[in-house]
Curated annotation (Swiss-Prot):
InterPro entries: Mitochondrial_Carrier, Mitochondrial_sb/sol_carrier, Mt_carrier_dom_sf. Belongs to the mitochondrial carrier (TC 2.A.29) family. The gene is Slc25a15. GO terms for biological process: L-arginine transmembrane transport; L-lysine transmembrane transport; mitochondrial L-ornithine transmembrane transport. This is Mitochondrial ornithine transporter 1.
Length: 301
């Protein structure tokens, strides 16, 4: 059975959802530490201190605060990302004058991934806003920035809607876009470049699970090294906006540099780098294998 664009899009969307699920289940505790250290750099002396204090204050469940919105965020983001990635690859082929079935270069794949990420950011921003607020709720309450309240996904969603309406879910959209668009150029570029290295003349589709995971991990490292300061600014905007203060990208950046120094923009980098390999490796492994399985089932029909 010959694939059509709608079926191909559905396969990419489903495979992206599988990849997003694998990414969260693998890396959620490190993501929680990252957001805490980004938002409250003066509160923790480092990753170990953040882990120990989180465990003593909230228990093991503290590492998995925000998992539900993180799952929704990653499933939504990666579903849209990989579905749009397929469409954007076709757009790149058209722009450079290639046949629909022609293989793209690593640079062209990176450009397609960058374009696709702009669409993914629109579904990611609301769910990531809820996730970041849940992850830092304990620190916001104990520091006196907000009053003690229910700490659930639904309570956070209701509070955002009550205070700011539907547009309130898009606090930090500009910084999310500024992170996603260049970041995913390096993400897909690093992934495809690494796959080309491991394939060394063979088809990339023949790579086993270990090279795929290493390639995904390398792509994740490339992404975070390129845009980490922007992610730090985004976390600040999304978390601190629950106090009622609305600060934009430039003002938040200038405030951090002026009051805390440039190094504050890299708070939480260590857990992010530790998380990058297993989480993004699992993402691409789940994506590639589930996509391959669905494509083989389709061709057998």
């Amino acid at each position: 059975m010959k694939s059509n664009p709608a079926i191909q899009a559905a396969i990419d969307l489903t495979a992206g959802a599988a990849g997003g699920t694998a990414c969260v289940l693998t890396g959620q505790p490190f993501d929680t530490m990252k957001v805490k250290m980004q938002t409250f750099p003066d509160l923790y002396r480092g990753l170990t201190d953040c882990c120990l204090r989180t465990y003593s204050q909230v228990g093991f469940r503290g590492f998995y605060k925000g998992t539900s919105p993180a799952l929704i965020a990653n499933i939504a983001e990666n579903s849209v990302l990989f579905m749009c990635y397929g469409f954007c690859q076709q757009v790149v082929r058209k722009v450079v004058g290639l046949d629909r079935q022609a293989k793209l270069s690593d640079l062209q794949n990176a450009a397609a991934g960058s374009f696709a990420s702009a669409f993914a950011a629109l579904v990611l921003c609301p769910t990531e806003l809820v996730k970041c607020r849940l992850q830092t709720m304990y620190e916001m309450e104990t520091s006196g920035k907000i009053a003690a309240s229910q700490n659930t996904v639904w309570s956070v969603v209701k509070e955002i809607f009550r205070k700011d309406g539907p547009l309130g879910f898009y606090h930090g959209l500009s910084s999310t876009l500024l992170r996603e668009v260049p970041g995913y150029f390096f993400f897909f570029g690093g992934y495809e470049l690494s796959r080309s290295f491991f394939a060394s003349g063979r088809s990339k589709d023949e790579l086993g699970p270990i090279p795929l995971m290493l390639s995904g991990g390398f792509g994740g490292i490339c992404l975070w090294l390129a845009v980490y300061p922007v992610d730090c600014i985004k976390s600040r905007i999304q978390v601190l906006s629950m106090t009622g203060k609305q600060t934009g990208l430039i003002r938040t950046f200038l405030s951090i540099v002026k009051n805390e120094g440039i190094t504050a923009l890299y708070s939480g980098l260590k857990p992010t780098m530790i998380r990058a390999f297993p989480a993004n490796g699992a993402l691409f492994l789940a994506y590639e294998y589930s996509r391959k399985l669905m494509m083989s089932q389709l061709e057998a029909c």
